Amino acid sequence: YRETIRKNKTYVSIGEAVVEIFKAPYSNDLRFDGARIYKGRKGSDVGKMDTILFKLQGGPVSTLQLDIVKNTESVLTLEAMKNYDYSLTGVVEIDEKPHYIIEFMQKPSVEIPLFMGSFYIEVDTYALTEAEFGFNLTNKAAAASIFIRKKPLGMEVTPEVASYRTRYREQDGKWYFAYSRAEVKFKVNWKKKLFNTFYTTMSEIAVTDRTTEEVIKIAGKEKIRPTDVFSEQVEAFTDPEFWGDYNVIEPDQSIEAAIR
């Protein structure tokens, strides 16, 4: 798992972790995924944040919520589908296999901000292997109320970009959650300042191994909560062999590509 915060083009915070995930059954909506930190590290330059201490909530839990096959309520339930228009727009090859491209966007009559994007469906199996989507930011005020938990008086925070990606991997005839990434860009404006500042948050998780043997649900006291700030759960960079053979992964490099 990795998360970063950039102020304009400068990285001001980075956190990384090896995490253990309890993946709840897809067939049971009442059981939820869980994660705990096995080991983690962080680095930050608070001075470059000026008067803003920008924090990202959720950590690995937020990336697990991008498993839209497990968390279907936003897009894939029959009730949610009433809010969207879907269209088959073409065929593309992914991992040497043809995939249908299904594009979706919220209906013009729906006022609350929802998602828009593309599903990639394998032609032979009809498996959803990848999804790329974003949040509709046409109504920026409504979107801001969803993304921002707390901000100082006199500050305007406007979401500019909210993009997401989820991938699944086939193993022994079944498809499993393999990767997800979220990137959200905010424009920050102080009423008495002339220039705007842009903050970009990125979080991503890549699954490296899985087992179905002796699976134990993560205890509540160890579980990362959606309200937790990941950077407050780990220590500063200390382990020179943190990633083993992959110890140096540049902030702009996808961890999915780096660990293949």
Language-model features: locations:
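Surface-exposed, low-complexity/disordered segments
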Residues: 1-83, 95, 148, 153-260
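Extended beta-strand-rich segments in extracellular/periplasmic secretory proteins, especially
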Residues: 67-122, 127-135, 166-170, 175
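Short, cysteine-centered beta-strand-loop-beta hairpins and adjacent loop/turn segments enriched
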Residues: 109-113, 138-142, 187-191
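Solvent-exposed beta-strand/loop surfaces of large extracellular or lumenal domains
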Residues: 141-149
